[in-house]
From Swiss-Prot:
The keyword Magnesium applies. This is Tau-cadinol synthase. Belongs to the terpene synthase family. SUPFAM superfamilies: Terpenoid cyclases/Protein prenyltransferases, Terpenoid synthases.
Length: 555
């Protein structure tokens, strides 16, 4: 609910202040203590089952068998246990494909060709979409006879979502497969029906791996008559091990967050620690990335306090003072600065220092200066946006707003906040990101455009009218409906750029490339489902939080 604007002591007008919903998880995780015996039992069982799965990988001989097993491991959230074995199998498959000139490695059915194409691209190997030409009729359309192959059509649909901009064949594959899946989803039997419905809402390539793993284990695989009981048992034990690990991390982070007591000191700001942590598991869910998850929580909480201070409370004059404090990175010369700004600034600096200590422990001290620079960069961008919103500067062109949005998408600060937790990150990685590569910009703008689509009406009702949608409508004289349609098209094109950029990033370790891909996935999954972000709206995230962190899987 928006409040009326008020005049403050510096003579400026405050923005309409949004009263956010309270935190629904305040005490849920803070007192959690992990049962080391239970966790140890899960770990022992996982290790024993892993040996049997390695034997399965070795025993799989045909390309089809190998691809299905790799895909199943990835859907179940187990592939991180077998990274070396999977990469070796994929290299063998690619060699076979190059000999056969067929993405199925000689198993010439639509399902296997599509599966091979998608998995190979998702692992950053080159493969041409020409492998699908054999399924086209004389007019260049997909043969209608394929529509009776439900699993094949679904596999084609999933493959179409790793396409690049210039791949019109895959554009047609997406249209063709979606049309037929929509027509059959209501008559399919469970669990295939649920699998198709999930794909239509969240194509697998755009889904968040750990979210999908929970869905696949609970709703698909354990109901599949052809399931492998060994894989199912490993998947359930692995998920419960991860769930306990996440609760332990949340307990530690809750204590870290609560010590600042910003809920009472800065009541205008969002109190969303658990929602921030969900982004952490979305970025990298594997156990070895604990510092990635912790770093992202620190980064997101910094972003939220800064965003809500600029966007939801500060006057233009106060925001300028706030920005200058970040530029100086010092409490010196802040006499006359309102207390709430001192509190907000002190939190940001303290949180940064916690990050800096973590970076030192990990031997990644070089990451801290860039993280600091992204905080200062974000302050300048938020300050500029507030001047536009409050009318102290004329409304920007769509191009000027979009350029500022590259920063307020938070792709740079969020990436910087986790770099110390990636073993492969070096100073060269940071230098690469400083050059604003198209791959990073494209992932950031997916999030920014989805946010603008979802927030246009909400922010307009709150008394503000500065979104990319609003700028586009004004500059080009189009309706909101037309602007939103254009933005959705732009998101689709950006995904094609992300796919191409991801596949081309072979000079950088895959864990870094996946980081940016997962940012886009988190944004896409949030906004396509709800037209709002899962951080601000606690009800939207409640179901995901319960499933990932609280509800046990049924064995």
């Amino acid at each position: 609910m928006a409040t009326s604007a008020v005049v403050n002591c510096l003579g400026g007008v405050r923005p309409h202040t949004i009263r956010y919903e309270p935190n629904m998880w305040t005490h849920t995780f803070s007192n959690f203590s992990i049962d080391e015996q239970v966790q140890g039992e899960y770990a022992e069982e996982i290790e024993a089952l892993k040996q049997e799965v390695r034997s399965m990988l070795t025993a799989a001989t045909t390309c089809k068998e190998q691809l299905i097993l790799i895909d199943t491991l990835e859907r179940l959230g187990l592939s991180y246990h077998f990274e070396t074995e999977i990469e070796q199998k994929l290299k063998e498959i690619i060699l076979h494909i190059n000999r056969e000139e067929d993405a199925s490695g000689g198993d010439c059915d639509l399902y296997t060709t599509s599966l091979g194409f998608r998995v190979i691209r998702q692992h950053q190997y080159h493969i041409s979409c020409g492998v699908f030409e054999k399924y086209l009729d004389k007019d260049g359309k997909f043969e209608e006879s394929l529509s009776s192959d439900t699993e094949g059509i679904l596999s084609l649909y999933e493959a179409a979502h790793v396409r690049f901009r210039d791949e019109t064949l895959l554009q047609e594959a997406a249209r063709f497969s979606r049309h037929h899946l929509k027509g059959m989803e209501e008559v399919l039997e469970s669990p295939l029906r649920e699998k198709v419905q999930r794909a239509l809402q969240h194509p697998l390539h755009r889904d968040i791996p750990i979210f999908y793993a929970h869905f696949f284990i609970s709703n698909i695989y354990q109901k599949d008559d052809s399931r492998n009981e060994l894989l199912l048992k490993l998947a359930k034990s692995n998920f419960m091990f991860l769930q306990n690990l996440y609760k332990e991390e949340l307990s530690q982070l809750s204590r870290w967050w609560n010590k600042f007591d910003l809920k009472s000191k800065l009541p205008y700001a969002r109190d969303r620690l658990v929602e921030a942590y969900i982004w952490g598991v979305g970025y990298h869910y594997e156990p070895r990335y604990a510092y990635v998850r912790r770093g992202l929580v620190i980064g997101i909480q910094i972003i939220a306090i800064m965003d809500d201070t600029y966007d939801n409370y500060a006057t233009v004059d106060e925001a300028q003072l706030f920005t200058e404090m970040f530029e100086r990175w010092s409490m010196d010369g802040i006499d006359g600065v309102p207390d709430y700004l001192k509190i907000a600034y002190h939190f940001v600096v303290s949180a940064f220092e916690d990050y800096e200590r973590d970076a030192g422990k990990l031997g990644k001290q070089f990451a801290a200066p860039y993280f600091k620079q992204t905080i200062q960069q974000l302050a300048r961008a938020y300050n500029q946006e507030l001047k536009w919103v409050m009318g102290t500067q004329s409304m920007p062109s769509f191009q000027d707003y979009a350029k500022n949005s590259e920063i307020t998408s938070c792709i740079y600060i969020m990436s910087a906040s986790v770099f110390h937790g990636l073993e492969s990150v070096t100073q060269e990685t940071i230098d690469w990101l400083k050059n604003e590569p198209n791959f990073a910009v494209s992932t950031g703008m997916i999030g920014r455009y989805w946010d603008d689509i979802g927030s246009h009406e909400r922010e307009s009702r709150g008394g503000k009218m500065l979104t990319a949608v609003g700028c586009y409508m004004k500059q080009y004289g189009v309706s909101k409906k037309e602007a939103v349609r254009k933005f959705r098209e732009q998101v689709e094109d950006l995904w094609k750029d992300v796919n191409k950029g991801y596949t081309a990033m072979t000079c950088m370790p895959r864990e870094t490339a996946v980081l940016f891909l997962n940012y886009a996935r988190m944004c896409d999954a949030s906004y396509t489902e709800n037209n709002d972000d899962g951080y601000t709206d606690p009800d939207f995230s409640k179901r995901k939080i319960s499933a990932l962190f609280l509800d046990p899987l049924v064995f």
